[in-house]
């Protein structure tokens, strides 16, 4: 069922031999961000026929008229920057690409000011797009391939098929990518039907941008996608760790420093969460880093979610925890709870605002990583 859901989420229209994925280039409006400009109003205010390209039309106007129209465009774009939002799954997909070691670039008809605003706000904490090409640059607009060819040159990529162009417009983004020889991914938000219904031969078509991760994992060789390894199950080696597993508060209070990890990397808080020792969680929660990544990168929240310790999880959620922080295998707390079919933990994490689109190393969301139909339905309904 999980494989069927993945096939529905990411429809691969062609299956060439697996190539390395060396970069992803994005469109902005409708792909990474929710469209928030009323272009009908913009065209009307500028006195431009909707069938024309507004920027080209303004360039042909007399100077005074062009200045007025340009000011209208800037005014509306400034308001657009203030209300800019990412599309669902965009940030999670960007985080997945970053963890896979895949560089990203941007080509948009927005201004440099909009790109700078994006980097400083919604994209904060993520690798910036480099190159990030706006209409302030000198390249021909999409679908002319000049901007994309410049990115390939900057990245020193000889084989364009090792790069993917991601966009929501068949006429602009898909054709743009195909002219440069790169693979193409269409985020099918419905725009293609406005443009005539064709996907213009996109290599992949998805309904949500996060679904591209599974498609990329299947289609390409990823830089950091090594084989899955088996690891030993550790035991606590410190007095504090052993006391935490036993739920012995008196022994913990006698320890010199309960915040330190032991040889496994686990803090006493992680050991307590793993064993379900709820009675000592408040004491350790106040003395340990609640977001510390222990053995294989798992946090206390990860361990509680995996083991189904709802009482422990609820106590941890009262602290300033990162509920989406994954382990080294890119498994998040919601992945663990969903895969292990811990219904109550899934509900608690959803109520805490966990991401419904967080992706594991294979590009699966928690809804795709569970065989429990009820859990899957709950996660999808919460999107």
Positions of the model-derived regions?
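Asp-based, Mg2+/Mn2+-dependent phosphohydrolase catalytic module
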Residues: 2-23, 95, 111-113, 117-235
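Active-site neighborhood of HAD-like aspartate-dependent phosphohydrolases
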Residues: 10-63
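Short, acidic loop-to-helix structural element flanking the phosphoryl-transfer center
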Residues: 79-106, 112-116, 145
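Ankyrin repeat A-helix N-terminal signature
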Residues: 242-247, 271-277, 303-309, 336-342, ...
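Ankyrin repeat structural motif
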Residues: 248-255, 277-285, 309-317, 342-350, ...
């Amino acid at each position: 069922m999980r494989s069927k859901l993945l096939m529905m989420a990411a429809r691969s229209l062609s299956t060439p031999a697996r190539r390395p994925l060396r970069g992803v280039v994005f469109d902005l409006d409708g792909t990474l961000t929710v469209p928030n400009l009323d272009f009908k109003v913009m065209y009307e205010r500028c006195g431009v026929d909707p069938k024309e390209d507004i920027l080209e039309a303004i360039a042909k106007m007399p100077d005074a008229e062009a200045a007025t129209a340009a000011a209208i465009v800037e005014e509306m774009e400034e308001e657009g920057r203030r209300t800019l939002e990412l599309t669902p799954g965009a940030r999670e997909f960007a985080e997945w690409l970053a963890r896979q070691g895949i560089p990203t670039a941007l080509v948009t008809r927005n201004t440099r000011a909009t790109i700078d605003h994006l980097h400083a706000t919604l994209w904060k904490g993520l690798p910036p797009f480099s190159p990030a090409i706006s209409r302030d640059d000198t390249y021909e607009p999409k679908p002319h391939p000049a901007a994309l060819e410049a990115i390939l040159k900057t990245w020193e990529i000889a084989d364009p098929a090792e790069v993917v162009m991601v966009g929501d417009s068949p006429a602009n983004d898909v054709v743009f990518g195909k002219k440069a020889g790169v693979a193409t991914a269409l985020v099918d938000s419905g725009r293609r039907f406005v443009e005539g219904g064709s996907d213009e031969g996109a290599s992949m078509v998805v309904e949500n941008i996060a679904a591209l991760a599974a498609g990329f994992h299947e289609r390409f060789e990823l830089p950091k996608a090594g084989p899955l390894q088996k690891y030993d199950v550790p035991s606590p080696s410190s007095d504090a760790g052993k006391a935490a597993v036993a739920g012995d508060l008196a022994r913990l209070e006698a320890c010199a420093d309960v915040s330190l990890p032991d040889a496994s990397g686990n803090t006493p808080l992680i050991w307590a969460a793993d064993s379900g020792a709820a009675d000592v969680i408040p004491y350790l929660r106040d003395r340990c880093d609640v977001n510390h990544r222990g053995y294989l990168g798992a946090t206390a929240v990860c361990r509680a979610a995996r083991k189904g310790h709802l009482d422990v999880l609820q106590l941890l959620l009262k602290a300033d925890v990162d509920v989406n922080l994954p382990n080294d295998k890119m498994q998040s707390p919601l992945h663990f709870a969903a895969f292990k079919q811990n219904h109550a933990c899934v509900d608690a994490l959803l109520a805490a605002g966990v991401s419904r689109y967080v992706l594991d190393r294979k590009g699966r969301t928690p809804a795709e990583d569970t065989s429990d139909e009820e859990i899957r339905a709950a996660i999808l309904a919460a999107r």
